Regions:
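Accessory, often N-terminal, substrate/partner-engagement and coupling regions
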Residues: 52, 56-115
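Nucleic acid-processing catalytic cores of prokaryotic defense/repair systems
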Residues: 1-80
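Anion-binding and metal-coordination hotspots
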Residues: 1-3, 7-12, 17-22, 27-36, ...
Length: 557
């Protein structure tokens, strides 16, 4: 059998200093007379590429196409290519949980003439995929393929936010039941607060809830609000609360406890938080309501912690590398002290390094005070004293040194008592609890799970861009925070599905590479996705989202 393949060939020939490219029509075949060896023969010489020119070559191509009935109009034209895969995945996760129905059950639609739940879905998908302002979202829709609804008006987006805020009290318990259904037992809730600040002073009134207060972002020069978040042990938010920016942490706990009791059908609940937030009054409130708690006690500048640890310190085997636990009971309160030799060594080494750098810096500063170089400003004892204190304070080392200035003489010595106590508590954690039955290891583990809420704050502030806030009225600010918390809820649900495969931000970036191309063929338009890779298919399968469709109809775009 003879196999023949025809093709265009460019043969190069050099004559003197010139290179000629000859355009030929050739065919390759296998010659049976030569043992089916491959051969090439020239069917036609069309001239040189330089002699024909670009225009003649294009006419030649067009003529060959006409010979088989192909016209420029019948060729496919790619009109646009927009991001799609991440939109499909995040929107599919929302749909799998049927969150639009949950919001409608809560009454989000009301008497609105538009589908408020669909617009909230859009806002949440945008917050996870490409967070931006509500106004910028309209431009974002031009760069992605969002198939579930048409282009909304900015006015309708804001009204959808208003509708969401109106049903917050009803919607949060319904959303919580949907998000945690069958996945975990709700006997443990974590509570923590953070703050977010605002740029500028627009529209501020005397009773505005944006106030100056303790800033977790270190921006004490900015007005802020305080946000309290109640989470499950898997890091899924149950509800959130917003307080004026000058609210003290521990004053929020009572209101949150009352809210959890009234809105969430929780049986035996253990409240987990930091001791600074759970004041004695708050602990009494929890005990009075027969709610349990697990709290961590500060190990420095706390006489009670010092008393408990001093009584248990001899129980720990410092030569044993395994994690150790010891406990005690006082006034119907159980105290568990955990000790990790590995963490102790790590903390001790890090502190020694910081102290070594500080000692070297202090030595150099004191040398310059004793023997000025004669250049620049001459150091003074008071100025050097201030510099040393500022350096130690900024490096969180001031408590380890005694810095004194007496009769213009600077004295810097180590605080041996403070360092000895640091050596004692390195690698230790002390928690108090009402749980008298669980193993010590489980008590400590439950408290450590509080770190999950810290990761939640980081997601809100970085990945989901809680800040900057492009709203200036209280109700819109509250609605914006609710949208961000909804996005965090969905992101945490997706994270659980993707565990061991990829993080949610990584999955979003991988799936973003799936594009939807808008093709025009013969005057008709169609929307075709790029082929999904094995990795992309695995991510969609893990999320339980339907595969990418072969094409999208015009009315869904």
């Amino acid at each position: 059998m003879i196999y023949v393949v025809m093709f265009i060939r460019i043969a190069k020939q050099k004559r003197g200093n010139k290179l000629y490219r000859h355009l030929q029509i050739a065919e390759s075949f296998r010659d049976p007379a030569k043992g089916n060896a491959p051969r090439t023969r020239i069917l036609a010489h069309l001239g040189t590429v330089e002699g024909l020119g670009e225009e003649q070559i294009e006419k030649l191509i067009a003529g060959l196409q006409r010979a088989i009935g192909v016209t420029p109009e019948s060729l496919p034209h790619l009109l646009s290519a927009r991001d799609y895969g991440h939109i499909h995945a995040v929107g599919g996760a929302w749909d799998q949980l049927d969150l639009s129905t949950v919001l409608n059950d809560a009454g989000v639609r009301g008497d609105a003439s538009f589908d408020a739940a669909a617009l909230i879905r859009m806002l949440v998908v945008n917050r996870i995929c490409d967070p931006c302002s509500k106004l910028a979202l309209l431009d974002w829709l031009e760069s992605v393929c969002y198939e579930e609804t048409g282009r909304p008006s900015y006015h309708h987006l804001l009204r959808a936010m208003d509708r969401l805020l109106l049903v917050k009290e009803t919607a949060e318990p319904l959303l919580a039941r949907k998000l945690v259904a069958g996945s975990e037992k709700l006997d443990l809730v974590f509570y923590d607060i953070t703050s977010t600040y605002f740029e500028g002073d627009r529209s501020l009134s005397e009773d505005d809830f944006r106030r100056y207060g303790y800033s977790r972002d270190g921006r004490f020069d900015k007005r802020q609000i305080v946000i309290g978040l109640v989470m499950t042990r898997e890091g899924i938010p149950l509800c959130h609360h917003i307080f004026p920016g000058n609210t003290v942490d521990k004053t929020t706990v009572g209101r949150v406890i009352e809210d959890i009791e009234s809105r969430f059908a929780l049986d035996r609940v253990v409240f987990v938080g930091d001791r600074g937030m759970l004041s004695d009054d708050n602990l009494d409130l929890l005990l009075g309501k027969e709610l349990g708690f697990i709290v961590a006690y500060p190990l420095r500048r706390n006489s009670f912690s010092r008393e408990v640890i001093s009584g248990l310190r001899k129980e720990f085997d410092r030569k044993n590398d395994s994690e150790q636990f010891h406990e005690g009971v006082r006034a119907e309160m159980r105290f568990v002290v955990a000790y990790s030799p590995a963490i102790a060594r790590e903390v001790k080494a890090a502190r020694a390094e910081r102290l070594g750098k500080a000692d070297a810096w202090i030595k150099e500063v004191r040398r310059k005070l004793a023997k000025p170089s004669g250049r620049g400003r001459v150091p003074t004892p008071q100025g050097t004293y201030d510099r040393v204190r500022d350096y130690l304070r900024d490096h969180h080392l001031l408590g380890y040194y005694n810095v004194e200035l007496n009769s213009n003489k600077l004295s810097v010595t180590k605080n041996r008592a403070a360092l000895a106590w640091e050596d004692t508590i390195d690698g230790m954690l002390m928690v108090g609890t009402t749980d008298m039955e669980s193993r010590m290891e489980d008590i400590v583990l439950r408290y450590k799970e509080l770190a999950e809420i810290e990761r939640g704050w980081r997601s809100l502030k970085s990945t989901l861009l809680l800040r900057p806030v492009f709203h200036w009225t209280e109700k819109r600010i509250r609605a914006h925070v609710f949208i961000c918390v909804l996005a965090l809820q969905l992101e945490r649900w997706m994270r659980r599905k993707l565990q061991g495969i990829a993080s949610v931000p990584r999955a979003v970036e991988i799936l973003r590479r799936i594009k939807i191309g808008e093709l025009e063929v013969g005057g008709k338009r169609t929307h075709i996705p790029t082929a999904a890779t094995v990795e992309q298919k695995e991510l969609l399968k893990a999320l339980g989202v339907r595969p990418i469709p072969a094409s999208l109809s015009e009315n869904r775009m």
